[in-house]
Amino acid sequence: MDRLLRIYNKEERLVVGLMSGTSADGIDAALVKVKGRGLDTKVELLEFEKFPYEEEVQKKIFELFDPHTGTVEKICHMNFLLGELFAEATLKLIKKAGLTPKDIDLIGSHGQTIYHIPNFIEDMGYKVRSTLQIGEPAVIAERTGIVTVADFRVRDVAAGGQGAPLVPYTEYILYRSPNETIALQNIGGIGNVTVLPKGGSIEDVIAFDTGPGNMVIDEVVKRITHGKMNFDKDGELASRGKVNEEFLAELLKDEFFKMKPPKTTGREHFGKNYVDNLMKKASYLEIDKYDLVATVTALTAYSVVRSYEKFIFPYYKVDKVVIGGGGSFNKTLVQMIKKQLPQVRVITQEDIGFNSDAKEAVAFAILASETINGNFNNIPKATGAKHPVVMGKISL
């Protein structure tokens, strides 16, 4: 415990944040200097790198997403294999920064989400929500020699929350403003928004998932290119097509878009089975491949904007929207969102000097630091939890 106490007493810490998102394309690793604690925390990004998964690793991860191929044996094995990969990424990042593991105080690892069940299931008299992230933190701690904080989401779920979104706590620390109301729109595999009312407290923050981000677009692109492309770089394919308005209207009837916040979603809803059905309908309608990419890109854009129109604009006058995540590099997608929000300034993380790719890795570095501080680091209004909790399990 002396080791934890030494870290606790430090006013300035070096923390590595690790993130592998729903796209499962690699590990985002950020080296962060964290000063202070609580809502007055100050953060400086010192180093960042993305470590892409080898094709074989990504294939094995995707097998875990499907209940038909994700056996207990495979999950058990991949939990430890991913722990090795997370540790390796950490050590490479530290070396790149010209430091040694002894210079680092903490690691905050999100892990890899394998399955997420945000809605209650009645079973044996219990109402149960659940979520599963792998990438064994004990392996990370063992290989690096660094205290590792991980498995954040389960504590929020245990308190009745959906275990997501978690980034709003850190977004309040980093982006809040006394002068303007800001909507932070992350577009990773799934899209999610955080609204920071001007001059508001952390209790005023609202956040929820808006629907698919890059997930459906990526899967459609893989299929129409027969695996030659994994995503639509710069939105180039979508820019060649025309949105099929009839099909888009059908897609927007999905029940998720009607749900009120707090709400979360994931690959369980908008993953392989969803795209299987989507491709069948597109084939029946004889939709051109470029038109199809344009249409599913519009699905993401429209789901974002409609979420604002239903759940944000009636209550807040948003001054600007800041888009982050991999979707911020999709020029066609960003342009679609801008076109539908002419009354709001729409910019990207890069426009304000932040790194879209690093954002979530930085967030888990901050959350880990707050775990050590013993501070609440969820926002119940965003996740639906009954009360604030300290998220994160510690491996020494």
Curated annotation (Swiss-Prot):
Would the keyword Coiled coil turn up in this protein's UniProt record? no
Q: Which gene encodes it?
A: anmK
Presence of keyword Kinase: yes
InterPro entries linked:
Anhydro_N_Ac-Mur_kinase (IPR005338), ATPase_NBD (IPR043129)
What does this chain do? Catalyzes the specific phosphorylation of 1,6-anhydro-N-acetylmuramic acid (anhMurNAc) with the simultaneous cleavage of the 1,6-anhydro ring, generating MurNAc-6-P. Is required for the utilization of anhMurNAc either imported from the medium or derived from its own cell wall murein, and thus plays a role in cell wall recycling.
Reactions that this protein is recorded to catalyse = 1,6-anhydro-N-acetyl-beta-muramate + ATP + H2O = N-acetyl-D-muramate 6-phosphate + ADP + H(+)
Question: A Pfam family name for this chain?
Answer: AnmK
State the name under which the record lists this protein: Anhydro-N-acetylmuramic acid kinase
NCBIfam families the record matches: PRK09585.2-1, PRK09585.3-2, PRK09585.3-6
Give me the residues that bind ATP, please: G21, T22, S23, A24, D25, G26, I27, D28
Please report the organism this UniProt entry assigns to the protein: Caldanaerobacter subterraneus subsp. tengcongensis (strain DSM 15242 / JCM 11007 / NBRC 100824 / MB4)
Note the Gene3D superfamilies from the entry. 3.30.420.40
User: Which GO molecular function annotations are given, in alphabetical order?
Assistant: ATP binding; kinase activity; phosphotransferase activity, alcohol group as acceptor
SUPFAM superfamilies per record? Actin-like ATPase domain
Q: Which keywords accompany this UniProt record?
A: ATP-binding, Carbohydrate metabolism, Kinase, Nucleotide-binding, Transferase
GO BP terms in the entry: 1,6-anhydro-N-acetyl-beta-muramic acid catabolic process; amino sugar metabolic process; peptidoglycan turnover
Q: Which CDD domains match?
A: ASKHA_NBD_ANMK (cd24050)
The EC class name is transferase
